[in-house]
Amino acid sequence: MKGALGSPVAAAGAAMQETFGCVVANRFHQLLDDESDPFDILREAEHRRQQQLQRKRRDEAAAASGAGHRGGRSPAVASGHRPGAGGRRESQKERKSLAASGAQQPDSPGGPQPPGQKRTPRRGEQQGWNDNRGTDVVLERAERRSYREYRPYETERQADLPVEKFTDEKPVDRFDRDRPLRGRGGPRGGLRSRGRGGPGNRAFDSFDQRGKRDFERYSSNDKTNRMEDSMGGCGIRPWGSGKDTSDTEPPAPMEETSMMEECQGTLDEESAAKVPELEVEEENQVQEMTLDEWKNLQEQTRPKPEFNIRKPESTVPSKAVVIHKSRYRDDMVKEDYEDESHVFRKAANDITSQLEINFGNLPRPGRGARGSTRGGRGRMRRTENYGPRAEVVTQDVAPNPDDPEDFPALA
């Protein structure tokens, strides 16, 4: 056990347990060398806070006394010493804080400025040179343009026009007046509740609207022409018919019946003139048919092919002589005889009949005969006798169709 504990592996394991163990109290060994009393630290902090309060009161009293000397500075401030500092020189940080507090006060254009500082010109002011005094003169514009104000060339010339013209629109500031505004719509931040850009586009005459068209609106009811449009589509609705209107139309008063009777005579004359026009329109309509009907129509209109077929001669020439009469009575038997009548003549030295040709009895080598010498699966090859075999001739006689014994069912 001692050897196991004294080994470097065990020492490293113990060190890892101590280093990476979950210790709740002071895990990282902080403030172990701090032997100071926390109560002493609290007392020093309280004493320091009281000193700061006393110093602040002294500074306020010195500032009040300095203000009574007609805005003049106290000798302590002029010499660079802070009052109540106990003879300590003013640090650079305190000087920066005093300069920042002085810059935050609102200074008038004609107010006194520190001798070593220059006020930077504000936005909208022009800085010029005065020949009489030789100092910088700040000229402030009497009328400054608003941030988002849009003034094209025409509006600058007509500056005396009343401002009520642009009451509905929000002014737009354009830095590059030669180039048209990008994008679609009116000025940025317009009345967004009315679509892209709102109605502010119409007030600017020089505004490039990038092809946007302003349509004129007519005060009319969209339901006034509804019946005429729907009748063009055959009915009060697109899926209705012309007869559906009679069901939905209100009954006409009795006073109009006399007028209808008078107009009926003229309508009859017009209808008689329109009848031939309707017939012409029906003829002009495209005739619809199925695929089978179209195919039949094409076959009827298609020209039939005509072939020049030469007929065989059935007459027997007069000079023909019969050499011998046929032994067969039927033409079918004659055709079979003609097929069998082709006999090939053999030469005298033909030896094909003496050769033995066996297609189905070829010698087959044993399995694995090539690997038998290497210890494979093969067997030793048997010696086969390839000598001449006895000739077995089997002659099949074809049945005779004229013999009822060969075909008893046909008898």
From Swiss-Prot:
There is a cross-link at K212, K274, K334 (Glycyl lysine isopeptide (Lys-Gly) (interchain with G-Cter in SUMO2)). The modification Phosphothreonine is found at T352, T373. Residues 42-271, 296-318, 358-411 are annotated as: Disordered. It is found in: Nucleus; Cytoplasm; Cytoplasm, Stress granule; Cytoplasm, Sarcoplasm. SMART domains: HABP4_PAI-RBP1. One of its GO terms (molecular function) is ribosome binding. The keyword Transcription regulation applies. Expressed in adult heart, brain, liver, kidney, testis, and in various embryonic tissues, but not in adult spleen, lung or skeletal muscle. The keyword Ubl conjugation applies. One of its GO terms (cellular component) is nuclear speck. Ribosome-binding protein that promotes ribosome hibernation, a process during which ribosomes are stabilized in an inactive state and preserved from proteasomal degradation. Acts via its association with EEF2/eEF2 factor at the A-site of the ribosome, promoting ribosome stabilization in an inactive state compatible with storage. Plays a key role in ribosome hibernation in the mature oocyte by promoting ribosome stabilization. Ribosomes, which are produced in large quantities during oogenesis, are stored and translationally repressed in the oocyte and early embryo. The C-terminal region is necessary for nucleus and cytoplasmic localization. The N-terminal region is necessary for nucleus and nuclear bodies localization. Regions containing Arg-Gly-Gly repeats (RGG/RXR-box) may be preferentially methylated by PRMT1. This is Intracellular hyaluronan-binding protein 4.
